[in-house]
Amino acid sequence: MHRFLQPVRERLRSALARYFGSRIMSSTQWTPNMYPSARRSDHIDTYRSETRGEVKVPDPYHWLEEYSEETDKWTSDQEEFTRTYLDSNPDRKKLEDAFRKSMDYPKFSAPFLNDDKRWYWFYNTGLQAQTVICRSKDETLPDFSESDYVGETFFDPNLLSSDGTASLSMYDFSHCGKYFAYGISLSGSDFSTIYVRSTSSPLAPGNNSIRNDDGRLPDELRYVKFSSISWTKDSKGFFYQRYPGTGTVNGQNGIQTQGDRDAMIYYHRIGTSQSDDILVHEDQEHPDWVFGAEVTEDGKYVALYTMKDTSRKNLLWIADLGQNEVGRNMKWNKICNVFDSEYDLIGNDGSLLYIRTNKAAPQYKIVTLDIEKPELGFKEFIPEDPKAYLSQVKIFNKDRLALVYKRNVIGELYVYNNTGSRLMRLARDFVGSMTVTARETEPWFFATLTGFNTPGIVCRYNIQRPEEQRWSVYRTAKVKGLNPNDFEARQVWYDSYDGTKIPMFIVRHKNTQFNGTAPAIQYGYGGFNISINPFFSPTILTFLQKYGAILAVPNIRGGGEFGETWHDAGIREKRANVYDDFIAATQFLVKNKYAAGGKVAINGGSNGGLLVAACVNRAREGTFGAAIAEVGVLDLLKFPKFTIGKAWISDYGDPEDPRDFDYIYTHSPLHNIPKNMVLPPTMLLTADHDDRVVPMHSFKYAAMLQYTLPHNRHPLLLRVDKKAGHGGGKSTEKRLQEAADKWGFAAQSMGLAWKDRQANL
C-alpha cells in the first residue's frame, strides 16, 4: 500500500476541488415536520417480563401490519414524499448513468455438466433483467477465448414477464438428462411455482414468448416455499417442499403475512396432477418445522433434513431408495435425531456417508458413517482446524475432495484424498472468496474466485492432466465501466468495547488518501452464522471513485466468520455485542483517519437492517453521517407472528418468554427511538412483496420515527419498492435504481462532492 502525503490545507481545498473537476455540494435543503401523517390508534399489547411482571406496550401503528387501502395510501404517500427528496439530488441522474455503465459487463457462472452430456452455465450480457441459462451445442467444454457468448440459450426467464419480475428460484435436471424442473417466483416472493420442461424445448427467444410457452409440460406445482428440487435416479419424479394452499393463491403471494406452518415433503411424478403427489413427510406436532429432501448423486439414498429454526442444528435421516417405496411409510435411518449440531451430507461412496458437521467442532470437520453398520458410529475423517472455518466440501473423481476454508475471512482452497490426507493448496496468492462446483464421478472441479477488486475468475482443476497443468484459469470477467485494478483492499483489526478483536476490510480507490477527509460506506450484517466475505460490487466501487470514499466491512460477532463460537457471541441476550462491534468500527475508522468524522454512512439489509437501526438508536449523536436500513427486522416484539419469523427466535430470543422479553425490549428499534437526540439522515428501504421480513417492520418504524422526531434536522425517509420482495430475484434495473437511490441519498444528505476524476495530491 502506498504512503500518502498529509492533508492539503483547508484554504486550498476549494480551489483544488475546482481544478480537479470536483463540485462541492451542500446537503439537500431539508424542511422538518412535513411528513405524510399516519393515524395513531390506541392499540396496546401485553407481555410478561421476568423482572417487571405484566408490561403493556402501546402499538399505535398496529394497523400497518396488514395490507389495506389505508396502508396502501400511506405507503404511496411516503414513496412520493421520498421520491421528491431523492430527485432533488443534482447528481442523481449522473450517478445512475455511472452505475449503469459499471454494471454493463458480461457476468457468468462456472459451467456444469448435465447428464445429457452438455455443459450449462448462467450468463448475463450485462444489463439483462434476469440471468439466463446457456448451454453448449455438444459435449465439448465451451471455449470463451474468442467470445463471451458461445453455445445457445436454454432458459431465459426474461421471456416470462414484461418487467423482469419473474425469476428462477430453484432448478434441477433429471438424471436421464431429458427433463428440467424449475421454480418461478413472481415479484420477489418466497413462494414459487414449479414447472417441468423437456431439455429439447428451450425457453429461448424465437421459440417462446411471454404469452406462449408451448415447450412446458402440463405439470404445475404451487405453494412451494423454502424448497429445493431433487430427482430420483429413475427420472420419474422429484422431491420438493410445499405448504397448504389456504390463503396463498397466486394473486396474494408476497402480500400475505400469516405465519408459515405445516410444511410437507412431497414426491411428484412427471405427467401427473399435483393433487396426486405422494406425501412423504410432515410433522403435525411441530407445525413450524421445515424440511428438505436431497437424493445422493448415485441415486441410492434420499436424505431428509429437519430444521426447527435458523440455528445451525438439524436432524438428518437417510432412506435407501432401493429398499423403500416412496411415501409416508418409508423406513428412515435416523442417524442424527436430536437438535444438537449441524449435519450436512456431502456425498457417499456406496454405504459410506461423508458428513460435514460442527458437532464438538465450532469451525466444522468431516466425519464418515457406514449406514449399513451404524453401530460403529461416526469416524473422524478430516479433523477441525481450530483456526480456519470449513465452509464448503465437494467430492470429485470418486476419491478426491475439494475443501474451502476461511482463515480470517479469506478463502483457502485445498485438495484431499480419500484417506483424509491434504495433498495440495491451490490459488495460494489469491485474497478473496472462493466457491467450488464439482461432480462426484468426474475428474475435475471448477472454483470461482471473487473479491473486492476481482469481479470473477473461474478456474479449473483436472486431475487427468499433467500435474503442472492441472490448475488453470478458465474464464475471467472483464468490467467495462471501471478498472478494478484502480482499487485496493486491506484488512485491519480493531478492539470492540469488551476488548474483542474484530477484523475489518477497507477498500479504496488508489488515489483516495487516508487522511481523515474521506467519506465512508460501512456495511454489516452480524447474525445467523452468515459470513460477509469479500464481494465485488461495481456500484459501490463507482461510488468510491466518484466521491473519493472508502468501503468498510467489519466482520462483527453474530456472523459465521469464525464458526459457531463467533455466532453464539452475538445472539439472544448477547445481541448488544453486535451493535457495539459495529459502532466501534465507525469510531476506529475516524480515529485512525480512514474516514472523516460525521461522514460514515452505515448500511445493512435484513438482519443488517436491524443492525443499522439499532446502532442509530444507541450511538452518540453525530457518530454516523447517514443510515440506510434495508428490509430490516425492526419490531422485535412482533417478528415471530409473521411468515417465517418464528424461525428467528434462535438468534433474537422469544418475546413471549418473560426472560427473553427483558433483553429484547431494550434493543428493539421500534421501541427505543431516542426522543432527545438528533438522528442522522436515515432512509428505510422495503418492498411490498417482501414475505420474508414483512414490510410492516419498516412501515411502523418509519411512522414512529417521523412522529417522535418531526423536527429532526435530517430527513427520516421510507422507500417502498413495488413488485419486489426481500431481494432475491430482483431485476437488474430494480437493483440499479435502488443503488442510485440509496448511495445518492448518502451523498446528498452528507453533502459529498462529485469528483469527475481522482486527484493524486
Curated annotation (Swiss-Prot):
Keywords for the protein's UniProt record, in alphabetical order: Hydrolase, Protease, Serine protease
Q: What is this protein called?
A: Prolyl oligopeptidase A
Cysteines joined through disulfide linkages: none
Which family does the record assign?
A: Belongs to the peptidase S9A family.
Show the GO cellular component annotation of the record: cytosol
EC? 3.4.21.26
Question: Which residues are listed as membrane-spanning?
Answer: none
Q: What does this protein do?
A: Housekeeping prolyl oligopeptidase (POP) that behaves like a conventional POP by cleaving peptide bonds on the C-terminal side of prolyl residues within peptides that are up to approximately 30 amino acids long.
Q: Subunit structure, briefly?
A: Monomer.
A GO molecular function annotation here is:
oligopeptidase activity
Q: Where in the sequence is the active site?
A: 606 (charge relay system), 690 (charge relay system), 726 (charge relay system)
Name the enzyme's class.
hydrolase
State the reactions this protein catalyses. Hydrolysis of Pro-|-Xaa >> Ala-|-Xaa in oligopeptides
Which Gene Ontology BP annotations are present? proteolysis
